[in-house]
Amino acid sequence: MYESITVPTLVVDGAKVRLNASRMLDRAARNKVVLRPHLKTHQARQVGRIFRELGLGSGTVSSITMAEYFAADGWDDLTVAFPVNLRELDSINALAGRIRIGLLVDNADSVRTLAAGLKHPVDLWVKIDVGSHRCGLSPEEPDRVAALLAEAAGSPLLHTAGLLTHDSRTYAVRGREAVSALYHEGATAMLALRAEMGKKGYSGLRVSIGDTPSASLVEDWLGVDEARPGNFAYYDLQQVGTGACQPESVAVAVACPVVGIYPERSEAVVYGGAVHLSKQSQPAMAEYLPGGPPDSCFGTVFRMEGEHWNGFLPGAWVRGVTQEHGMVHMQADDLSHLKVGDLLFICPVHSCLAAHALREDTHFI
């Protein structure tokens, strides 16, 4: 199955993707929430088609370019969950003339430029910052939010959809209780802001949230309207660390050719470095890596069962990366069975970054 792999390659287990997506759909259905999955994790038409086979008709992307890619494969309802880039107004108009598109704003300049330059209607989402401090208006500043809604109301082509947030704080904690506490805090703030906007005359606003740890761990989604998780399709080492999934649910591995073996330092070196795995690291997880890294790692080695991975190989992790090299610590017995030219299957810390880096070298099984 892997004879054709000659360079670092993202291997995608389609059966695991389908199972992960089915589980997330079930969680959304139990909460009566529309699932609008983020497609940036995989950026792959094959995965998008799995979603659509399961009944999903709307998606989320992070750029106009990505929206064009998926629109070409039949997606006709996409939200660009990134602050609108006004330099792409021509591309926005071309896309909005073909499909339903949602745009994200948090300032009046963007709203005014869109109102003046749009040729087709778009859905407009106001970005709210519930604590990530990246983009968005604070839910504690309802007057600023109302002013933005008022600005948008003056244009017949700006259809105000609602309030949108992404609470990245959930990626920095671990376990159901900690993730749930942050989710409840953020969702409650969003729902309160919607109620306040209703008092100011802006009724019918939807609330859209989106992060995989919350969507995977929180049982009660508190009545929000829409959820936009994306990483759940693949999961990764970071999600294992938050408790969002078990290692067995990770649907991707980076297949890296072994180029050197160094028993004297308990290491192998693979062709698979920062440009393939990224430089994002993950704190050690002793329960999954007995004898594992003291501080952090750049990926873990999957235990292979035939042609499929299932859990982690004990005591095996990527201790460091340079541009093309990956230095992999391994236990002596596992190292003794390894040969130069073999493949090691690495669980990436952040599958979104690995998938983007290896989008031209992806192998589906």
Predicted regions and their residues:
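Flexible, glycine/charged-enriched surface loops at secondary-structure junctions
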Residues: 34, 199-206, 355-359
